[in-house]
């Protein structure tokens, strides 16, 4: 998936997550910044979820900022998929291609 421009999804409310993405010059790089109110407990799980979604949609060449306020895994995945669709100017997600 090609990221065309910067985008934002989510809020900074409790139990939610705000994710921001922007393309960078190196089309193979991944600049990932995660801050979470529950990072000590769930930091590894948050990072694994983010990387899983990015790998599933074959996203590289981006800066991704994750500001988590205790969001559940399903919320994080939904916010990331929304973010990718917005940044790639997709009208709909390719649901049929999901494993």
UniProtKB/Swiss-Prot annotation:
Subunit organization: Oligomer with a subunit composition of (alpha,beta,gamma)6.
Subcellular location per the Swiss-Prot or TrEMBL entry: Cytoplasm
Biological role: Covalent carrier of the coenzyme of citrate lyase.
Gene: citD
This protein's UniProt keywords: Cytoplasm, Phosphoprotein
Identification of the protein by name: Citrate lyase acyl carrier protein
Residues modified as O-(phosphoribosyl dephospho-coenzyme A)serine: 14
Highest taxon of the lineage: Bacteria
Family note: Belongs to the CitD family.
NCBIfam families membership: citD, PRK13253.1
A Gene Ontology cellular-component term: cytoplasm
